[in-house]
């Protein structure tokens, strides 16, 4: 009976999205329906996560067809902590949108498309079937295509074209990889694939397939293939930029972690050094971007790229500590990047400018923004006891164990550069004076302060409750790095199957 609840985090937003299509002229009902739906989704996800931590992973086989023949959803520590975190930030993002009137009269059916994107994101985390992962990716991407093209500026349309083209190429590669892998192993269920690939051992065809998946997921995670991200994020409104920054690249990073710990772990000698190299390149590119621009929205976009480099560096170490740190940092970064884009969007709203020179001592007039920005900087920089610290320490440890001293050095340097770029903004927030010009600051709406306060509290709480979160991420790491344990807990009936 409990396993049936596993469908609800995806089903509830889907049903809500359909209902909202017919409520385009009733803002009040739409608001309460959405917020209620996502709040319930978050609570259910958290309850399932607590159960899994105390007992064992949950599986749901649709239509009574057991794996590997039927569609299977898996609720383990990794998938459920991602679903819980994603549901929580989606709730805040939509509350932000309703607060600023973006959803008034259900404009462009915006809430529905955000919910459809949420369905794809949550489904990607829960599915234990390769083809259904592709389906969830496509649901997510189709909704994101609509969201990124909502606007009338030429700049936004140009960014949308780049985003759409690169993601379509990534989807083609993903589908190609699925076809080749099915031809090779004859199954699409994750645990069954892992078992058959282990039986095959080292194989050139499998190596080629793993490289195809690596490129496909790298495009979605902005790992080296980042060209779409800065332009796309810079032209989106605050709500959508926060949504994309918090979730879109993280789904790609999640797929990389799931695939290259559980499925293709027998190709460690090739894939993991390649992942570490790509992570290093991504960190360097991100670091160059954050110091090259004065546009605070582009600085925020390149911060996303740096964080992806950190996460994949942990995966590339191929150590328990490094992978554990990557998962912890992945979860933390969803919340931190939501906070970053909310703050940046609010600064643009208040001043009317995207350049940090025009902040003109804003933090003196609005201390909350100064405090929130400082906490966010420390979380991004991994300063103890803030939320970024445990993940970075574990990634450092993994890099040391792996002997990847270059990656370790680059992570330290790029962390300092990331903090420097944000401290530069903070300086103008306290001491800025754009040639003595007067900047008329808009009054900050109360709902922005409330949402920022919630996110700041959560960021602090993650740092304080790090042992609790690490217990979850450690279980996730253990399950996904042990094929036998995964097989035993998820699909024990497949044991010994030809």
UniProtKB/Swiss-Prot annotation:
Membrane in keyword set: yes
Topology with respect to the bilayer: Multi-pass membrane protein
Taxonomy, superkingdom: Bacteria
A single MF term (Gene Ontology): antiporter activity
NCBIfam families assigned: PRK12663.1
Family matches, as PANTHER family: NA(+)_H(+) ANTIPORTER SUBUNIT D1 (PTHR42703:SF1), NADH DEHYDROGENASE (PTHR42703)
Assembly notes: May form a heterooligomeric complex that consists of seven subunits: mnhA2, mnhB2, mnhC2, mnhD2, mnhE2, mnhF2 and mnhG2.
Record localization: Cell membrane
Pfam family, one: Proton_antipo_M
Keywords: Antiport, Cell membrane, Ion transport, Membrane, Transmembrane, Transmembrane helix, Transport
Listed transmembrane segments: 2-22, 32-52, 78-98, 108-128, 130-150, 161-181, 209-229, 240-260, 271-291, 308-328, 330-350, 369-389, 403-423, 451-471
One cellular component (GO) term of this entry: plasma membrane
Family from the record: Belongs to the CPA3 antiporters (TC 2.A.63) subunit D family.
The keyword Cell membrane appears for this protein: yes
Official protein name in the record: Putative antiporter subunit mnhD2
InterPro entries: CPA3_Na-H_Antiporter_D (IPR050586), NADH_UbQ_OxRdtase (IPR003918), ND/Mrp_TM (IPR001750)
Gene Ontology biological process terms in this record: ATP synthesis coupled electron transport
């Amino acid at each position: 009976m409990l396993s049936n609840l596993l469908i609800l985090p995806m089903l509830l937003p889907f049903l809500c999205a359909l209902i909202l299509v017919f409520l385009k002229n009733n803002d009040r009902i739409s608001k309460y329906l959405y917020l209620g739906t996502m709040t319930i989704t978050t609570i259910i996800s958290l309850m399932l996560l607590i159960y899994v931590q105390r007992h064992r992973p949950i599986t749901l086989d649709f239509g009574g067809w057991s794996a590997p023949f039927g569609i299977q959803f898996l609720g383990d520590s990794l998938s459920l902590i991602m679903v819980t975190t994603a549901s929580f930030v989606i709730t805040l993002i939509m509350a932000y949108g309703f607060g600023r009137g973006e959803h008034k009269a259900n404009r462009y059916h915006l809430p529905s498309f955000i919910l459809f994107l949420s369905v794809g994101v949550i489904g990607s985390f829960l599915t234990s079937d390769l083809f259904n992962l592709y389906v969830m990716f496509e649901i997510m991407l189709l909704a994101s295509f609509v969201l990124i093209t909502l606007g009338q500026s030429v700049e936004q349309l140009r960014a949308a074209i780049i985003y759409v083209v690169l993601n379509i190429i990534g989807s083609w590669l993903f589908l190609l990889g699925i076809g080749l892998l099915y031809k090779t192993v004859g199954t699409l269920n994750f645990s069954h694939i892992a078992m058959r690939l282990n039986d095959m051992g080292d194989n050139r065809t499998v190596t080629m397939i793993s490289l195809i998946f690596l490129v496909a997921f790298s495009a979605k995670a902005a790992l080296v293939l980042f060209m779409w991200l800065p332009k796309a994020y810079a032209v989106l409104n605050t709500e959508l930029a926060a949504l994309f920054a918090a979730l879109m690249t993280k789904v790609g990073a999640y797929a990389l972690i799931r695939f290259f710990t559980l499925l293709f772990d027998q190709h460690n000698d090739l894939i993991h050094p390649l992942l570490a190299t790509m992570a290093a390149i991504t960190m360097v590119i991100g670091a160059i971007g954050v110091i090259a621009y004065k546009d605070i929205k582009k600085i925020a976009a390149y911060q996303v790229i740096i964080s992806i480099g950190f996460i994949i560096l942990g995966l590339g170490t191929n150590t328990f500590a490094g992978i554990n740190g990557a998962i912890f940092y992945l979860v933390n970064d969803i919340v931190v990047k939501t906070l970053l884009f909310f703050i940046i969007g609010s600064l643009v709203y208040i001043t009317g400018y995207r350049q940090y020179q025009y902040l003109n001592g804003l933090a003196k007039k609005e201390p909350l923004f100064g405090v929130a920005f400082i906490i966010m900087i420390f979380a991004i920089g991994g300063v103890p006891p803030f939320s970024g610290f445990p993940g970075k320490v574990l990634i450092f440890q993994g890099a040391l164990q792996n002997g990847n001293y270059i990656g370790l050095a680059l992570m330290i340097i790029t962390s300092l550069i990331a903090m420097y770029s944000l401290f530069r903004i903070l300086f103008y927030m306290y001491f800025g004076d754009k040639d003595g010009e007067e900047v008329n600051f808009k009054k900050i709406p109360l709902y922005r302060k409330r949402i920022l306060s919630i996110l700041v509290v959560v960021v602090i709480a993650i740092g304080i409750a790090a042992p609790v979160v690490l217990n979850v991420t450690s279980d996730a790491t253990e399950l996904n790095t042990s094929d036998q344990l995964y097989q035993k807990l998820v699909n024990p009936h497949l044991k010994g199957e030809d």
